[in-house]
UniProtKB/Swiss-Prot annotation:
Function summary: Involved in the modulation of the specificity of the ClpAP-mediated ATP-dependent protein degradation.
Pfam family, one: ClpS
Family: Belongs to the ClpS family.
Species whose genome carries this gene: Nitrosospira multiformis (strain ATCC 25196 / NCIMB 11849 / C 71)
Assembly behavior: Binds to the N-terminal domain of the chaperone ClpA.
Signal peptide per UniProt: none
Protein name (database record): ATP-dependent Clp protease adapter protein ClpS
Amino acid sequence: MAARNHGEVVLEAKKSKLKPPPMFKVILLNDDFTPMDFVVTVLQTFFSMNREQATQIMLKVHMDGAGVCGVYPNDVASTKVEQVVAFARQHQHPLQCVMEEN
């Protein structure tokens, strides 16, 4: 923003107030048909987890009915949900993946 001060131009700094983007949890839901090994593969492939991390999340999904795979900005979370669901369908598994605001 510019202001005039006796014929001189004085620039005023305007502070930008950017907020971080809203974050979304990507959640796998349990079902009675998708094999545990497939869930581990999904977690390793789409969420870059090692086998131990993937197994822990898979067991949480199995025992509690759902497990958080990660927290991402909206567009990344949405893409991951679509990729997981498409991969599961491609392999004929009913695995569900959803996202919710963190």
